[in-house]
Design a protein with these regions (language model features):
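Structural motif corresponding to the early beta-alpha repeats
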Residues: 1-21, 27-37, 52
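Short loop-to-alpha-helix "cap/lid" segments that border enzyme active sites
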Residues: 19, 23, 34-126, 130-131, ...
Length: 151
């Protein structure tokens, strides 16, 4: 399988995102700011490339909005990336579309999250760091926990 490049954007002009996608510089755009349905529809008119919308899960309304997002995939997180904080994952029992799970994941938590909620993918940053740097042992333990529980 080919490794796909993902550009992460926070409130970037849709024209800029589309230009990078259409030129083949990136394969997928992850929208991690306040991009709403109108923004995504506008971006859709400029490109047909895959879009991931990051949604901060703060309450039932934020999850309901994620459910109807026009993005191809949803990344559910507790806040701005890299905080290491989880949201109340039990709300995922009622979420019916493909999603990436982020926030509060680490080698000790990802296995149970994958086994119970079956996300399409998981996203991790600070959960595999030691003293602010990626830790190879934590990365290996994280991947092993996902593989063990992804059945």
């Amino acid at each position: 399988p080919q490794i796909q490049t993902v550009g992460v954007f926070v409130n970037e002009a849709p024209e800029t995102v589309a230009e990078l996608l259409n030129a083949g510089i990136i394969d997928i755009a992850q929208l991690h700011g306040q991009e709403d349905e109108t923004y995504i529809h506008r971006l859709r008119k400029l490109t047909n490339k895959p879009l991931i919308q990051a949604v901060r899960v703060t309450d039932a309304a934020s999850l309901a909005n994620a459910q109807k997002s026009p993005a191809d995939l949803i990344l559910l997180d507790s806040g701005a990336g890299g905080t290491g904080t989880a949201f109340d994952w039990t709300v995922l029992d009622k979420f019916s579309r493909l999603y990436f799970l982020a926030g509060g994941l680490g080698p000790d938590t990802v296995g149970n999250a994958v086994k119970r909620f079956h996300p399409y993918a998981v996203d991790v940053s600070s959960g595999i760091e030691t003293a602010g740097k990626k830790d190879p042992a934590k990365m290996a333990a994280f991947v092993a926990a996902v593989r063990k529980n992804d059945k």
